[in-house]
């Protein structure tokens, strides 16, 4: 009891001491900051932005500070942009800014900068977009011990196409699948890209690698050889397989190109080697599979003549189905991988613009 009384007397004396030394004037305000209250808030006005290969895009990001928070405005603002990998396990550095100091990383060098529309604008501009730029980006703003983030998805206009090499179906491990797409002016597709293609009508009964290492395939018309006739349409998922040992096809993604895709008018049919040389003689190169799909899907290219492509396959693009030219649906028709010495086909060429 005596201890409690002594504690009360000490508290009263300490309060009197404070009141004699510190008076609350009209111009003096005490701010009590809630421990869990946000002192720095980062927001993206759009969760997803759209563009195309070769274009420019702004990834939106703004930050808001509590000016009444203790220490607000005394630290330099650090803005960091990273790209999230498809499996979300890693982040790839893109751009960092703090005051006058700025740094870009890797393939983004010379192509990215802050928009700087206002003092609280952390939006990132990416120029001359590549296929690899597709994905999710994280905007992180740091002030002292405070930080917050926002995520923006960059989507590219383009087309997904299934691919397998001359060796036949189910012959690519994951790493070979990645290279196969690159060789055809494309990149390995993401699940989101395949899903969007399925919603757009893509139906393919062979499983292929996706960028996250999963193996899947899209079915719009269920049938016995493709998961069963009584199943519902959807993207079938085989799961994740050994990237070195497991072998499947691949789904590739490509977008707009900066050049001209065309069927070469030639007086005779050509062998593969003659086709390659004919394009070179015309100031071009033999076209790749990704380029014929991009021309068909994005430009509406239509030609009922089978022609050689760079991988040794023979195909032709039909945008307006008609008799003798894929009468049932618009598609890039696949003839096959014929003997390269056969003198039976024309050639599709591609001339890049400088």
From Swiss-Prot:
- Principal place where this protein is found? secreted
Q: List the disulfide bonds.
A: 61-139, 181-252, 205-226, 279-349, 304-325
CDD domains this protein is in? Ig_LP_like, Link_domain_HAPLN_module_1, Link_domain_HAPLN_module_2
Keywords from UniProt, A to Z, are: Disulfide bond, Extracellular matrix, Glycoprotein, Hyaluronic acid, Immunoglobulin domain, Repeat, Secreted
The answer to whether keyword Disulfide bond applies is yes
Q: Which residues are glycosylated?
A: 21, 56
| The keyword Metal-binding is annotated on this UniProt entry | no
Localization in the cell: Secreted, Extracellular space, Extracellular matrix
Which residues does the UniProt record annotate as the domain Ig-like V-type? 38-152
Task: Give Gene Ontology CC terms.
Answer: extracellular space; perineuronal net; synapse
Q: Which PROSITE patterns match?
A: IG_LIKE, LINK_1, LINK_2
Query: Which superkingdom?
Result: Eukaryota
UniProt propeptide residues? 1-9
Family note: Belongs to the HAPLN family.
- What is the documented function of this protein? Stabilizes the aggregates of proteoglycan monomers with hyaluronic acid in the extracellular cartilage matrix.
Q: What's the protein called, per UniProt?
A: Hyaluronan and proteoglycan link protein 1
Q: Which organism is it from?
A: Sus scrofa
Gene (UniProt): HAPLN1
